[in-house]
Amino acid sequence: MPFESLRHTAFIGIGCAHFAAGRYERAALWAQSGVDAFPASFWGERIVVAAAVHAGARAEARRTARKLLRKDPDLTVSVARRAWPFRPDFMERLADGLATAGMPRA
């Protein structure tokens, strides 16, 4: 398949769509599928963390956030907010989820 190497992007994109719609469990599952397919997709792990918080899986979100911070120690909530051009309400929920999971704010 010519686009097989891009499937992680599709999975994470589907996760983002579910996150935008407030379907956090589905968002976490799809985004995690993308991360599993391409572990270097740190941006996908941001969705996994925030979606897990909003789905009520805070312990899992904290574990994933710690793992993400080991891979990307300079990541903060404010860095994540500046990285994407999503709607303000999406970004607010993302930032809230990341902060709740223990990501530094600045």
Spans of features found by a protein language model:
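Alpha-helical protein-protein interaction modules
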Residues: 1-106
